[in-house]
């Protein structure tokens, strides 16, 4: 799993997140997200910024919400399963395209340590190749995205 954040005037680096081998399914846990948020968010967000993350259980866990409250982070509330309202979903799609363009061998790579290391390198290369204009354009689409979802009564939109 990877984490990154962007806004109209900023973009973080891409952060690979290792799963917790002690967790039930070995995935990323709220503890990992808490450490990440405590490391990044205080310097990342300015007063008045609204933070948006998807509604994955790891992001909505009580401990994570408590950390966000402690940090004074205002979180955008939005319905689950609403990628139309989350512009980073568009970036993840661009990233996948770019990764396979730069490293086509990854499409059918076995699940090995070497493949994972190559995927991390490819993802960082792809993330670093994103043009600022794409990030600005996606940020600027938020008012239109919200309007489109309202007009579609919560159904699918072009986003």
Task: Give the positions of each predicted feature.
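Electropositive, glycine- and tryptophan-enriched low-complexity nucleic-acid-binding patches
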Residues: 1-47
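Short interface patches used for recognition in eukaryotic signaling and trafficking proteins
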Residues: 21-22, 76, 105-109
């Amino acid at each position: 799993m990877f984490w990154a954040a962007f806004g109209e005037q900023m973009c973080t680096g891409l952060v690979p997140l290792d799963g917790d081998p002690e967790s039930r399914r070995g995935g990323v846990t709220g503890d990992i997200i808490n450490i990440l948020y405590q490391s990044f968010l205080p310097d990342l967000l300015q007063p008045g910024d609204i933070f948006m993350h998807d509604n994955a259980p790891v992001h909505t866990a009580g401990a994570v919400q408590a950390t966000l409250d402690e940090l004074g982070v205002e979180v955008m509330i939005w319905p689950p399963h609403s990628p139309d309202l989350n512009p980073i979903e568009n970036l993840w799609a661009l990233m996948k395209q770019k990764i396979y363009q730069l490293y086509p061998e990854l499409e059918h790579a076995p699940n090995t340590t070497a493949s994972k290391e190559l995927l991390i390198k490819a993802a960082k290369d792809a993330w670093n190749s994103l043009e600022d204009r794409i990030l600005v354009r996606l940020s600027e689409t938020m008012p239109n995205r919200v309007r489109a979802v309202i007009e579609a009564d919560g159904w699918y939109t072009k986003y």
